UniProtKB/Swiss-Prot annotation:
Protein name per Swiss-Prot or TrEMBL: Histidinol dehydrogenase
Pathway: Amino-acid biosynthesis; L-histidine biosynthesis; L-histidine from 5-phospho-alpha-D-ribose 1-diphosphate: step 9/9
Gene Ontology terms, MF aspect: histidinol dehydrogenase activity; NAD binding; zinc ion binding
Textual note on the cofactor: Binds 1 zinc ion per subunit.
Main enzyme class: oxidoreductase
Catalytic activity, EC: 1.1.1.23
One example of a Gene Ontology biological process annotation: L-histidine biosynthetic process
Active site: E332 (proton acceptor), H333 (proton acceptor)
């Protein structure tokens, strides 16, 4: 048996729960020094450094003049994708766009009785960079990453949207990625992967423009690079391994549960798959079903390692306990396979995305339902949210006083300024109300 169910009240169950509650980790991933060197090289050498690293790790024949994807390459990409893909792409774009356009925020103003005007001005950032992983050398293009990161930026009104992605050894990028980017209005695409791609977006080179926001998933080098440049640019988040928590009662189908745990496990050997169930029979049926389905998967080796090392099945007393534990764990993806999932929604406080009912696999949210699939991991759902339109917006406060309004507030402003020992602040009011 790849995974053995535990009772939540047992010592083993409590130990597993403790590890889940303390899974947040930020430390040296083992590549910090190497990434720092890459960032320094790109900052100082620009395109030359990007080309150097690209030649070393991706395309041996890369040149600076070939970093930017050309119109001819885009046109060729359209010849290489089929009509079925274009149909699915259009449908996914419509779903994702329809959801995210509801997130757009408006500027607002408030005029008080004394004539003071205060408000908030909402504006998009000028530029955003999307990092899209190569996807097993381009053989498994991550089209969903293009859509989930690029569409919200477009809705926000970002003028300059650029994409970087590693080329294959032949210097080419997956036609599916090129078409997806083009269909959502991204016209600047560059062949730059890993930490040097992030560095180029953060610092700018002669070819690749510097941006204000960097979003997109990647390996430990990409994640470390984003962490190191955050502060000088906004990043979406520091993402850990992907994770799912399934709450199931006696009505849940072990086949569905196993399928969804494996869907998570095939991402990464470090992916986390958790089942909290009120039913012992369900808990005992799932491991056998996992083993049966595992044999059919293309990424069986990765999924099996993830299940063996990282999967957890805990039997709990009731749904209330399961929801309480789910809130404590603050999972990225929360699935409710129970009789009345909607009844529990008011009790859920911490989850990146919530999937209600047995016919709502996480995969629907990953690709097509509409909500964003870039979600907080490692327990950060306690305070963080999914990537969205807001990721690409910034807000400025508006304040306008009339002479009468300032006269009315002057005493209060000066009193607080003097209390803090900032007499120049107080004086800046006093000289206006003499």
């Amino acid at each position: 048996m790849l995974i053995e169910p535990k009772m939540i009240g047992s010592s083993e169950g409590q130990a597993l729960l403790e590890s889940l509650l303390n899974r947040f980790q930020i430390g040296d991933s083992g590549c910090q020094s190497a990434v720092e060197d890459i960032l320094t090289a790109v900052r100082q050498e620009g395109d030359a450094a990007v080309v150097k690293y690209c030649r070393r790790f991706d395309c041996p024949d890369m040149t600076a003049s070939a970093l930017a994807v050309t119109a001819a390459e885009i046109a060729a990409a359209y010849e290489l994708v089929d009509a079925a893909f274009l149909e699915t792409l259009a449908a996914a774009i419509e779903r994702i766009h329809s959801f995210h356009e509801r997130e757009m925020e408006d500027s607002w103003m408030q005029t008080r009785e004394d004539g003071t005007i205060v408000g908030r001005l909402v504006r998009p950032v000028d530029s955003a960079g999307l990092y899209v992983p190569g996807g097993t050398g381009g053989s498994t293009p991550l089209v969903s990453s293009v859509l989930m990161n690029g569409i919200p930026a477009g809705i926000a009104g970002v003028t300059t949207r650029v994409m970087v992605t590693p080329p294959g050894k032949d210097g080419k990028i997956s036609p599916h990625l090129l078409v997806a980017a083009t269909e959502i209005g991204i016209t600047e695409i560059y062949k730059a992967g890993s930490a040097w791609g992030i560095a180029a977006l953060a610092y700018g080179t002669a070819t690749i423009p510097r941006v204000d926001v960097i979003v997109g998933p990647g390996n430990q080098f990409v994640t470390e690079a984003k962490r190191l440049v955050s502060g000088m640019v906004r990043i979406d988040m520091i993402a850990g391994p992907s994770e799912v928590l399934i709450v199931a009662d006696e009505t849940a189908d072990p086949v569905y549960i196993a399928a969804d745990m494996l869907a998570q496990a095939e991402h990464d050997p470090q992916a986390l798959s958790i089942l909290l169930t009120t039913d012992r029979q369900v808990a005992e049926a799932v491991p056998a079903e996992i083993e049966r389905q595992l044999k059919t998967l293309s990424r069986a080796e990765i999924a099996e390692k993830s299940i063996v090392d990282r999967a957890v099945i805990l039997v709990v007393a009731d749904i209330e306990e399961a929801i309480g534990l789910a809130n404590d764990i603050a999972i990225e993806h929360l699935e409710l396979m129970i009789v009345d999932p909607w009844a529990q929604v008011p009790h859920i406080r911490h989850a990146g995305a919530i999937f209600l009912g047995s016919h709502t696999p996480e995969a629907a949210g990953d690709y097509f339902a509409g909500p964003n699939h870039v979600l907080p991991t490692m327990g950060t759902a306690r305070f963080a949210s999914a990537l969205g339109v807001e990721t690409f917006l910034k807000k400025s406060s508006i304040i306008s006083y009339s002479q009468t309004a300032l006269q009315n507030d002057a005493e209060h402003i000066q009193r607080l300024a003097n209390l803090e020992g900032l007499t120049a602040h107080a004086n800046s009011v006093a000289v206006r109300v003499k």
